[in-house]
A protein has these predicted regions:
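PLP-dependent amino-acid enzyme catalytic core
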Residues: 1-495
């Protein structure tokens, strides 16, 4: 019997995994969630001997039950190959009393590669399974990392086109250069004069525009999403938490069944939600530590039970977390209100109309497995400097937010469980912020000179993703206002 996916906003909308991957977003703006969380089938003695690819199969087959073994193994083989610069795919590095799970060894040096290298293969396979003849148009909003990882994943993939919107002044110079130099005739990159939340709202609006959908269909196109709202992004992310636990076991850092904490720098809530799903599958997890930057809407939510986006949007040195509407949180809300779509819709309606909602005491009780805290800009910079001076290990700004929050958590609770920190981007992606945190003397250096300095300092070679863009020509220079997004998509598609 296939595991089905249901919309968080409509109990009657049930689809298979492949249909959920193709649709991306459910009708009425809902998100697809599995009707139940499957339990891990293998024991840890087996899992600890497995490669990343083998672990991926064992986890993903439980969620993508309408894929054949051959289909799923092919997707995995095509995703986790030499695009990653280490055979381990996601190595663990011990520093500062924790284990950093390095999720940045893929082609765009950010954790998004872990899911976005497999999503195109899942999507093309899903299209074949469902006899889809239309060309699939991936529509994505990015706060910096998703965009490039999605572009790299879909560039040149037959039967697809991809359009990425990013906030023109809301990403790092290296993030922007990575996107606007992207090769591939099926790619389009557009800078909007607005912030990430506006880009994400614009994309969601296009998804739910019935008239646009009809025009697209008539021209032989249909939309899907590469954002973390797509279940095809979420499922591959569960894998690396299972893999990390198995590796800790193999190294003798933990005993079988021993609980670990997982600490995740959080913006759109997808990465920590994957850890929550892993815990519900039977992964022994104590606390899920949700780390925010100055845009601390999630910290306030865990503290008070009130989600309130009515606040200033702050641009920080950890831009992938500069988010006030945390999309994937809806999947957790749906779960803690007893999988009740009506209750969830009411809360989401309040968010849309008033910019806030409050959960019940009973729902808040269901969040006791989470701990939320945040780091200011100063604390983030101080954490980068401290860990470099203490361990010779250089982390990026997002990872530093998580490491800083972990430091607060330990001091507050005295909890000394083994902790895995999701290291979500290479420091080379945020070179200026990282280097000036270590020493202000770097403030006036040119971007690529800083890259070489960081390489010498960290004793790590410059990643290919950075070398490639040093001299790459700009291929995309389109900009638009927030209300001009749909017109740009139509122009690219020739509708």
């Amino acid at each position: 019997m296939d595991l089905m996916y249901v919309s968080t906003r409509n109990a009657n909308e049930k689809v298979t995994a492949s249909q959920a991957i193709l649709k991306g977003l459910a009708d009425q703006g809902g998100l697809f969630v599995p009707t139940k969380i499957p339990a891990l089938e293998l024991d840890w003695d087996q899992l600890k001997e497995m490669s990343y690819q083998e672990t991926a199969y064992e986890v993903m087959k439980l969620f993508l039950t309408d894929f054949t073994e051959e289909e799923l193994k092919n997707c995995i083989k095509n995703a986790y190959d030499e695009k990653f610069d280490t055979e381990e795919i996601a190595p663990l590095r011990k520093a500062d009393g924790a284990y950093f799970l390095e999720l940045f060894h893929g082609s765009t040096i950010a954790f998004k590669d872990m899911a976005l290298s497999i999503l195109p293969h899942l999507m093309i396979t899903s299209a074949r399974k469902n006899q889809i003849k239309n060309e699939i148009v991936i529509l994505t909003a990015t706060s910096g990392d998703t965009g490039k990882a999605a572009l790299a994943g879909f560039a040149g993939v037959e039967g697809t086109k991809i359009v990425v919107f990013y906030p023109k002044n809301g990403v790092s110079p290296i993030q922007e250069k990575q996107m606007i130099t992207q090769k591939g005739d099926n790619t389009c990159v557009i800078g909007i004069h607005g912030n990430f939340d506006q880009a994400q709202t614009g994309v969601k609006t296009m998804f739910s525009d019935k008239v646009l959908a009809e025009e697209m269909n008539a021209a032989g196109y249909q939309f899907s999403s590469a954002n973390s709202i797509n279940i095809g992004r979420l499922v591959p992310q569960i894998v690396y938490y299972v893999y990390a636990y198995a590796k800790l076991l193999k190294q003798g850092a933990i005993k079988k069944g021993e609980e670990i904490n997982i600490d995740v720098p959080t913006g759109n809530f997808g990465n920590i939600l994957a850890a929550f799903y892993a815990k519900n599958m039977g992964l022994p997890v104590g606390k899920l530590i949700c780390a925010s930057n100055d845009n601390k809407v999630l910290y306030d939510f865990f503290e008070t039970g009130v989600y309130d986006k009515n606040r200033d949007f702050i641009l920080t040195t950890s831009p992938s977390m500069d988010i006030l509407i945390s999309s994937n949180l809806e999947r957790l809300i749906y779960r803690i209100c007893g999988n009740d779509a009506e209750k969830n819709v009411k809360l989401m309606q309040e968010l849309k109309e008033e910019g806030k909602y409050e959960i019940t005491a009973e729902m808040k009780e269901a969040l006791s497995g989470f701990y939320g805290n945040y780091c200011t800009e100063e604390e983030t910079a101080a954490t980068i400097k401290r860990i470099y001076e203490q361990d010779g290990y250089v982390i990026d700004t997002h990872t530093a937010v998580a490491a800083g929050v972990y430091d607060k958590y330990r001091k507050e609770t005295g909890d000394d469980k083994v902790t895995v920190i999701a290291s979500t981007a290479s420091p080379f992606k945020f070179t200026r912020a990282v280097m000036t945190a270590i020493d202000p003397k770097y403030a006036d250096m040119e971007d690529f000179a800083l890259v070489d300095e960081l390489s010498a300092l960290a004793k790590v070679k410059v990643p290919n993703a950075i070398e490639e863009i040093r001299t790459a020509p700009v291929k995309h220079d389109i900009q638009c206002e927030v209300d001009g997004m749909q017109a740009e998509v139509k122009k690219f598609l020739g509708i």
